């Protein structure tokens, strides 16, 4: 088989710019394009959530992909498929739709992240089975189905059970990438038992009355990856980053590989970015100040000269750092900064951040609606970006930030230490704190602010950050090698 004939289907619960809650969406927006440059044909499947605007993203119906039967144990549901090209590419992205499951705005959640457990369990089963049935109708047979996180973790088991003898699926291999080890898809077993044949439900990884989707995927995928070498070691050996996966991963005979993320340097390039106020580069930095001013207008908060603008962009949950930021707010504001918090998620954190912003309107701003255009403007207009995730497999925001001269201040986890060169005398591209406490965060940010007020040294730091190379090419070559190894070529 020649390299150009390899076909890979990527299956994910989120893809930017259609839906974004985490770095997974950014990965999906750019990595398949990088793989195509390595001689692979890539396509994507994801759910068609109610939040996705058909007109904005030019989705259209595919007549031959309408009324596809999705066989479940006690019933047969129907799905329809819409398609568009991933922006700035020719990669076909298929959106699986059923009004009952996806018309509501909510994304996939589990026992730890949401309340509608029955509805979410039915949704995830329908989606995973629907992906395979859509492939049959489409008649496009991938060599590899690359599943991402727990949302797609049922597919490897389905291929080993009910689809095992289906001629279409013979020879297809599966890869599962763990982006978020702490989001595992813990869902009630009784719904799986009701909707899936016994040979599937009986093989699910089960604890008490719940199924663990991520565990099930880990047990059945042909190859496992995560998004940095250090995080691969962390989830194998450390209790907190591993989130209970250590034992099951240790039993998978060395099939886990860590590959550091890259970014799409065509989409994330301040000299060509159409989503920012004014483009800039290392030899014409005035545009960064224009973006700072535009960001000030966007969040309705005047930015004072000499006061750094610090951003926090995250999903509001404990693992992404919401609790650490909440505990640090008073000390952060005492540093004499403008603080922008952008994200959504747990309503208790959203309320806490909103109350604090309302109490400090000249110093703190909260944005819970963060479309792609705002994300680009924020990255371009900020002076510093705080990344407080307790568990960070790799992350991509820090790479976006450095490319735009926005200096990261991040907790030392996973790919953070593989992508940020820690500031030292005459070198480095960002700041890293190593104790997960408010004092450690505030102390490191205070150090960064001290350098900010030394304009000559700060500009040298900004130049070093902006000239880092975060392109996907190296990671794409590693993945291409793993794919070929998996296919025995």
Swiss-Prot record:
ADP-alpha-D-glucose binds at residue 20. It is an enzyme of class 2 (transferase). One of its GO terms (biological process) is glycogen biosynthetic process. Keywords: Glycogen biosynthesis, Glycosyltransferase, Transferase. It comes from the Bacteria. Its EC number is 2.4.1.21. Pathway: Glycan biosynthesis; glycogen biosynthesis. Belongs to the glycosyltransferase 1 family. Bacterial/plant glycogen synthase subfamily. This is Glycogen synthase. It comes from Chlorobium luteolum (strain DSM 273 / BCRC 81028 / 2530).
């Amino acid at each position: 088989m020649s390299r150009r004939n390899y076909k890979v289907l990527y299956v994910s619960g989120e893809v930017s710019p259609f839906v974004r809650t985490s770095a997974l969406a950014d990965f999906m927006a750019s990595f398949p394009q990088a793989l195509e440059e390595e001689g692979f044909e890539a396509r994507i499947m994801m759910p068609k959530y109610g939040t996705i605007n058909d007109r904005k993203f030019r989705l259209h119906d595919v007549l031959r992909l309408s009324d596809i039967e999705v066989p479940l144990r006690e019933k047969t549901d129907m799905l329809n498929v819409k398609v568009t090209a991933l922006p700035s590419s020719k990669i076909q992205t298929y959106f699986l739709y059923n009004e009952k499951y996806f018309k509501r705005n909510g994304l996939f959640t589990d026992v730890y992240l949401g309340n509608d457990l029955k509805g979410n369990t039915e949704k995830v089963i329908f989606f995973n089975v629907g992906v395979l049935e859509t492939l049959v109708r489409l008649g496009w047979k991938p060599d590899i189905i690359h599943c991402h996180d727990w949302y797609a973790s049922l597919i490897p088991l389905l291929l080993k059970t009910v689809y095992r003898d289906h001629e279409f699926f013979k020879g297809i291999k599966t890869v599962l990438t763990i982006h978020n080890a702490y989001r595992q898809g813990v869902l009630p077993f009784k719904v799986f038992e009701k909707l899936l044949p016994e040979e599937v439900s009986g093989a699910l990884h089960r604890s008490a009355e719940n199924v663990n989707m991520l565990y099930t995927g880990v047990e059945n995928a042909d190859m496992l990856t995560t998004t940095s070498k250090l995080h691969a070691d962390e989830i194998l050996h450390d209790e907190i980053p591993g989130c209970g996966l250590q034992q099951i991963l240790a039993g998978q005979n060395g099939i886990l590989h860590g590959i550091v993320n890259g970014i799409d340097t065509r989409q994330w390039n301040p000299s060509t970015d159409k989503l920012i106020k004014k483009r800039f580069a290392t030899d014409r930095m005035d545009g960064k100040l224009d973006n700072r001013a535009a960001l000030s207008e966007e969040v309705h908060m005047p930015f004072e000269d000499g006061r750094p603008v610090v951003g926090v962009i995250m999903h509001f949950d404990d693992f992404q750092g919401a609790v650490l930021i909440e505990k640090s707010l008073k000390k952060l504001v005492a540093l004499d900064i403008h603080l922008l918090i952008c994200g959504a998620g747990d309503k208790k954190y959203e309320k806490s951040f909103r109350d604090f912003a309302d109490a400090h309107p000249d110093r703190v701003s909260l944005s819970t609606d963060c479309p792609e255009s705002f994300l680009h403007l924020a990255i371009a207009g900020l002076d510093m970006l705080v990344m407080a995730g307790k568990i960070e497999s790799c992350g991509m925001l820090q790479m976006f930030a450095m490319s735009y001269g926005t200096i990261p201040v991040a907790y030392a986890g996973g790919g953070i230490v593989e992508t940020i060169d820690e500031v030292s005398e005459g070198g480095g591209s960002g700041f890293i704190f190593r104790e997960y406490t408010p004092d450690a965060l505030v102390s490191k940010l205070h150090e960064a602010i001290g350098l900010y007020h030394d304009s000559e040294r700060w500009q040298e730091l900004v130049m070093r950050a902006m000239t880092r190379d975060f392109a996907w090419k190296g990671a794409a070559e590693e993945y291409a090698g793993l794919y070929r190894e998996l296919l025995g070529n």
